[in-house]
């Protein structure tokens, strides 16, 4: 098995206990894609890299990188933790879900520098207070092709027109213009505002996003649409998504009643 001692940049996707004193840590690296690292002695008192391998950490490291199998971290150069994500249970849930999707969407050891940058940018936006639900929607939409689902979102899937109202059709693999709605009696009846955001988010450069305001009803509609597509067409159900759904349910119950 070939190994290479080198610098790398990484986003910590998750960590798990391994044996009595060790951790298995999965990083999404800029240079090598997703890699699993064995960190020996990580649970021992006085371990020097404790702060560098906390959840929601990004930074530069030196590692013994294996082509296949486990790699090893030798030292950390410069790291930082997404503090607000770590401290806020809702931001934490959205960030964990995004990283779960990325981990599921791509094979290990496949360099994906563009996606590394997108994930880092998405986490930065959430950490900075940009609407975590909307950042998550953007990532869900842009990840769909990686799961083998690439809906037609820029024009009608039948005729290509983009000057009429749209609806979403799972049967036709994307948008149907109003002239072809009768072709699919089971189209999703999505609002035009929701369709607008769906189309915009599919091509949005996260580097150009600094703030966004979406009405609560539209945010809810986007969540429903993403759930429908991921449930029926993609079939991916990370544990982190179930926890996120529970969180949203708790939040709805905890909202104070409105006065009439």
Swiss-Prot record:
Pfam families reported for this sequence: RecO_C, RecO_N
BP terms from Gene Ontology: DNA recombination; double-strand break repair
Keywords on record: DNA damage, DNA recombination, DNA repair
GO cellular component: a single term: bacterial nucleoid
Highest taxon of the lineage: Bacteria
Cited PANTHER family: DNA REPAIR PROTEIN RECO
Annotated family: Belongs to the RecO family.
Function per UniProt: Involved in DNA repair and RecF pathway recombination.
Name of protein: DNA repair protein RecO
Organism, scientific name: Levilactobacillus brevis (strain ATCC 367 / BCRC 12310 / CIP 105137 / JCM 1170 / LMG 11437 / NCIMB 947 / NCTC 947) (Lactobacillus brevis)
Gene expressing this chain: recO
